[in-house]
Amino acid sequence: MTTPTAIRRLDAADPDFARHLDHLLSWESVSDDSVNQRVLDIIKAVRERGDAALVELTQKFDGLQVASMAELILPRERLELALTRITPVQRQALEKAAERVRSYHEKQKQDSWSYTEADGTVLGQKVTPLDRAGLYVPGGKASYPSSVLMNAIPAKVAGVTEVVMVVPTPRGEINELVLAAACIAGVDRVFTIGGAQAVAALAYGTESVPKVDKVVGPGNIYVATAKRHVFGQVGIDMIAGPSEILVVCDGQTDPDWIAMDLFSQAEHDEDAQAILVSPDAEFLDKVAASITRLLPTMARAAIVETSINGRGALIKVADMAQAIEVANRIAPEHLELSVADPEAWLPHIRHAGAIFMGRHTSEALGDYCAGPNHVLPTSGTARFSSPLGVYDFQKRSSIIYCSPEGASELGKTASVLARGESLSGHARSAEYRITDLDWKTGNLEEGK
């Protein structure tokens, strides 16, 4: 006999619901002191000793016997070789996914713009891609080629000149799918290094690893902590927490589908969060039964069970309107609207990393091949953050080109404001360009 699931049950009608929900959502992402200090030591070593430190740390943490950085560099030919080592079906899937991701992100490209005022002054914005981006990819058997596509393709679409990938190969384990994905995505350089030391190398540069402008990509607590510390020296994408899925269902979807959708995120790790919200209490019972029945069939059953029982929940609400309220409160990474008319509810969704609309749109499709990016804000940060995209690899510069007439008119306003702030250098710089002698006589002699 299968033991019933121990997943948490909440009811929005409970007077303590808000408190219980806050407790469910709480997750501490801050590194402990020992991790923090180890990361600081690693960053210091890489900054001071460059390649030598990378070689030593790779030997220590990845169990590799390497004598120099030359052994930790993969040439383009090795990426092309990986394409021949995966199956034709795998290559076709990677290429199709890459094509869809590229097509979607092409639509995110921003163009420079400008306009001319009546006096000839030109104002505008110049959009420029980053020179170099660094992509961190977890290594070993738990590698994710889809992450390579999702991080590298937007950078290349943005026009980044060089994409540098770092991927650890613990005990010499190389994932051919990851290298094949790097080849398809157009990654320019690959180093087989990982951990905090790889992040430090990308941020500060070494004799072999070029310094980048931005570091993106997922990693463990050491990688995340290193990204926190190098932020400011370089840009970063985000500090990602555990994966999350929130399913809002009207009770009409197959319970097995919903259970498996919850599993799709719960299988990532024990801290992942999978939540179902529905106004149908009987449907929640059916999904709970599906969870119990399907759990033993999962390859990562132990991880799924820990996640579901520890951080998962089935939440009963009064109606669909309240379900949407709860969804906005949670601000999930992935939100499935498994309802009859998702378009009707879409305008009411304010906070979600990605929104999967309709019963047939499983979150897994977004993870791999739908097209939108799967690098999404977690831990409620969808309230103020967005998915990774082309815009993360472009920067904007303001353009101001004053005509003599424009400089004269703007100078009057600038002079008054600058003198109001007691910044006479600013004021005089603007005033030198004012051609209206009457204005100068009437204002500057009065010390204004």
Swiss-Prot record:
Residues binding substrate: S243, Q265, H268, H334, D367, E421, H426
Binding site for NAD(+): Y136, Q197, N220
GO cellular component: cytosol
UniProt enzyme class: oxidoreductase
Keywords: Amino-acid biosynthesis, Histidine biosynthesis, Metal-binding, NAD, Oxidoreductase, Zinc
Pathway the protein takes part in: Amino-acid biosynthesis; L-histidine biosynthesis; L-histidine from 5-phospho-alpha-D-ribose 1-diphosphate: step 9/9
Domain of life, source organism: Bacteria
Catalytic residue list: E333 (proton acceptor), H334 (proton acceptor)
Listed SUPFAM superfamilies: ALDH-like (SSF53720)
Chain positions recorded as Zn(2+) binding sites: Q265, H268, D367, H426
Entry EC number(s): 1.1.1.23
Cofactor(s) needed by this chain: Zn(2+)
Parts of the chain that traverse the membrane: none
Cofactor annotation remark: Binds 1 zinc ion per subunit.
Signal peptide: none
Gene3D superfamilies linked: 1.20.5.1300, Nitrogenase molybdenum iron protein domain
Catalysed reactions, as listed in the record: L-histidinol + 2 NAD(+) + H2O = L-histidine + 2 NADH + 3 H(+)
One BP annotation, GO: L-histidine biosynthetic process
GO function term, MF aspect, one: NAD binding
HAMAP family: HisD
Function: Catalyzes the sequential NAD-dependent oxidations of L-histidinol to L-histidinaldehyde and then to L-histidine.
Family, per entry: Belongs to the histidinol dehydrogenase family.
Record-given protein name: Histidinol dehydrogenase
